[in-house]
UniProtKB/Swiss-Prot annotation:
Domain of life: Eukaryota
Coiled-coil segments on the chain, per record: none
Matching SUPFAM superfamilies: Photosystem II antenna protein-like
Protein name (Swiss-Prot/TrEMBL): Photosystem II CP47 reaction center protein
PANTHER family: PHOTOSYSTEM II CP43 REACTION CENTER PROTEIN, PHOTOSYSTEM II CP47 REACTION CENTER PROTEIN
GO molecular function, one term: electron transporter, transferring electrons within the cyclic electron transport pathway of photosynthesis activity
GO terms classed as biological process: photosynthetic electron transport in photosystem II
Membrane topology classification: Multi-pass membrane protein
GO cellular component, one term: chloroplast thylakoid membrane
InterPro entries linked to this entry: PS_antenna-like, PS_II_antenna-like_sf, PSII_PsbB
Gene responsible for this protein: psbB
Length: 508
């Protein structure tokens, strides 16, 4: 046919058998990638420290998705929560990866079979003897089957009726585990952070899909609608399918970036808004205040703060700190976290407690400023010493640590105080191992950032694809210069324009 490279899909336009074949091959490629990627991640994943070196710090991308659906154990004898397991069963991480690879192989063989045996009776219109597809009927079948799968997932897998449940955690990402979830049928089901909404929405959407599928199987579209929406044209299917995909991609980009019950912070890392709003910092101070109210000492109160909670309150875990073109995991950036040094409390020579202003998300550098409880600047690390009034040396700032590895240790020499003031800009202070991975000290994004960027980008691309193919479908006659009621046989892609001498005409 002499088609240009970007017209490759035209060859399956009027060939239902091979259209099916290429879609099965596409499924084979997707499943094969998923299984292979899972095996690669399992080969490089270190499960030894789920608190300070969780999957999202290591740049794992497919392991979090398996985990949120209920997979927690490995055939290697480890569990994602840090324990050991003796009988992980078939549905371990490796089992899921293997299932995808086997499925990919079967799809590969099926694709070859359908490519070779393309001229099947099922694709033949008995009235004309030509290949054709009953697209409204196929739409009904797909809607019914996807509705069934959606309902089954919500009613059985998520609820634990037949399945493990899903990953559920507390608002601060400390106690997460896989557990069954009851559907939330009240208004709380619309809260994106309520796991019960996942069950109820899948049940409701699945029911709707089943009913809609049955409707489209039993009711034919009216002729005017059929013609108006070009329901006989396969490019209509392409256009509307692209619309469904880009819409879903925009939705999941939002739920990932802003956070939801479907994207737990234990699996994907915290969101940037939790840093911006001081979310974890407020909870830490609330716990410390509660401890002090129970007559605990500062040291005791801070020592009871979970290391996991303190680690979330560190800017290096903010997905918006990584540049778009900085490849690699968070561990390749600031290093592997080894331990929490403790919470630094700064005081001036008058005994006032000072607080270091934290670095906003989109700053790479930020002045070190210490303010008192009323927000008045009391000390800083000046850019020009000659004009300084509030330098650490002049104000006599000291630092004492509570909780963590440096619990009870205090420093008064200005060099050390300034060092910890700079580090306190970044949240809680951690010891980071940059030698093991040759980490360069430049922040990276978490899988939360990569997922969002990828899906938002492709959603935009697919949006234009929807417009393109939708317009081609609706205005095909205009673009081609062909009257839709013409009785000439026109093969799109084969002939450049009407009037081609090789165009066959139906016998009068």
């Amino acid at each position: 046919m002499g088609l240009p490279w970007y017209r490759v899909h035209t060859v399956v336009l009027n060939d239902p058998g091979r259209l099916l074949s290429v879609h099965i091959m596409h499924t084979a490629l997707v499943a094969g990638w998923a299984g292979s990627m899972a095996l690669y991640e399992l080969a490089v994943f270190d499960p030894s420290d789920p608190v300070l070196d969780p999957m999202w710090r290591q740049g794992m991308f497919v392991i979090p998705f398996m985990t949120r659906l209920g997979i927690t154990n490995s055939w290697g004898g480890w569990s994602i929560t840090g324990g050991t397991v003796t009988n992980p069963g078939i549905w371990s991480y490796e089992g899921v990866a293997g299932a995808h690879i086997v499925f990919s192989g079967l799809c590969f063989l099926a694709a070859i079979w359908h490519w070779v045996y393309w001229d099947l009776e099922i694709f033949c219109d008995e009235r004309t003897g030509k290949p054709s597809l009953d697209l409204p009927k196929i739409f009904g079948i797909h809607l019914f089957l996807s509705g069934l799968a959606c309902f089954g997932f919500g009613a059985f897998h998520v609820t634990g009726l037949y399945g493990p449940g899903i990953w559920v955690s507390d608002p601060y990402g400390l106690t997460g585990k896989v557990q069954p979830v009851n559907p939330a049928w009240g208004v709380e089901g619309f809260d994106p952070f309520v796991p019960g909404g996942i069950a109820s929405h899948h049940i409701a959407a699945g029911t709707l899909g089943i009913l809609a599928g049955l409707f489209h199987l039993s009711v034919r579209p009216p002729q005017r609608l059929y013609k108006g929406l070009r329901m006989g044209n396969i490019e209509t299917v392409l256009s509307s399918s692209i619309a469904a995909v880009f819409f879903a991609a925009f939705v999941v980009a939002g739920t990932m970036w802003y956070g939801s019950a479907t994207t737990p912070i234990e699996l994907f890392g915290p969101t940037r808004y939790q840093w911006d709003q001081g979310y974890f910092q407020q909870e830490i101070y609330r716990r410390v205040s509660a401890g002090l109210a129970e007559n605990q000492s500062l040291s005791e109160a801070w020592s009871k703060i979970p290391e996991k909670l303190a680690f979330y309150d560190y800017i290096g875990n903010n997905p918006a700190k990584g540049g778009l073109f900085r490849a690699g995991s968070m561990d390749n950036g600031d290093g592997i976290a080894v331990g929490w040094l403790g919470h630094p409390i700064f005081r001036d020579k008058e005994g006032r407690e000072l607080f270091v202003r934290r670095m906003p998300t989109f700053f790479e550098t930020f002045p070190v400023v210490l303010v008192d409880g009323d927000g008045i600047v009391r000390a800083d690390v000046p850019f020009r010493r000659a004009e300084s009034k509030y330098s650490v040396e002049q104000v006599g700032v000291t630092v004492a640590f509570y909780g963590g590895e440096l619990n009870g240790v205090s420093y008064s020499d200005p060099t050390t105080v300034k060092k910890y003031a700079r580090r306190a800009q970044l949240g809680e202070i951690f010891e980071l191992d940059r030698a093991t991975l040759k980490s360069d000290g430049v922040f990276r994004s978490s899988p939360r950032g990569w997922f969002t960027f990828g899906h938002a980008s492709f959603a935009l691309l697919f949006f234009f694809g929807h417009i393109w193919h939708g317009a081609r479908t609706l205005f095909r006659d205009v673009f081609a210069g062909i009257d839709p009621d013409l009785d000439a046989q026109v093969e799109f892609g084969a002939f450049l324009k009407l009037g081609d001498p090789t165009t066959k005409r139906q016998a009068a």
